[in-house]
């Protein structure tokens, strides 16, 4: 049934974005401190904004189902990213878009690319796609074989680590 197909493959519908979409609502802002090899976080204090020297970048959740324009942006430490952005639609528990980035323009490019892919995982640097995996089925699954999917995920991880993501952090599942 074509209506079912559309409902399954058209689930990534964020409102139109600009780099201003990722502005912090207040400063200083609390920092979420990652713990290596875990999903547990700590209070990392406060910071005025992105500070690469202190390993502080932006982390945003972008509503993707109803184009509400709801975006929550915080600061993140312990991820290691030195440039670019990493984004995914595989984001337990809500599966909204999660994007971590050094620059608002790369974060915007990453979210826009996920919309074009109808979901997935993407690594962006200086506005260019470094690596990606389309997950058009609900923003969570692909039509690719398990072998091809595993290969793409390995390339995504390598790309994220090449931009500085710490070796003790899974670039996507940690988000």
Report the location of each language-model feature.
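Active-site microenvironment of metallo-dependent hydrolases
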Residues: 1-175
């Amino acid at each position: 049934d074509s209506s079912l197909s559309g409902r399954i493959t058209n689930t990534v519908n964020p409102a139109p974005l600009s780099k201003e979409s990722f502005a912090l609502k207040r400063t200083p802002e609390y920092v979420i401190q990652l713990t290596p090899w875990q999903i547990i976080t700590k209070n990392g204090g406060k910071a005025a904004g992105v500070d690469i020297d202190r390993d502080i970048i932006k982390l945003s959740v972008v509503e993707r189902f109803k184009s509400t324009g709801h975006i929550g942006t915080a600061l993140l430490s312990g991820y290691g990213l030195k440039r670019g952005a990493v984004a995914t639609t595989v984001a337990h528990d809500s599966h909204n878009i999660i994007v971590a980035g050094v620059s608002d323009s790369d974060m915007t490019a990453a979210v826009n690319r996920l919309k074009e892919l109808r979901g997935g995982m993407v690594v962006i640097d200086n506005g260019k796609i470094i690596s990606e995996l389309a997950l058009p089925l609900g923003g969570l699954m692909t039509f690719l074989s398990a072998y091809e999917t595993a290969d793409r995920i390995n390339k995504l991880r390598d790309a994220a680590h090449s931009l500085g993501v710490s070796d003790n952090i899974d670039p996507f599942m940690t988000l």
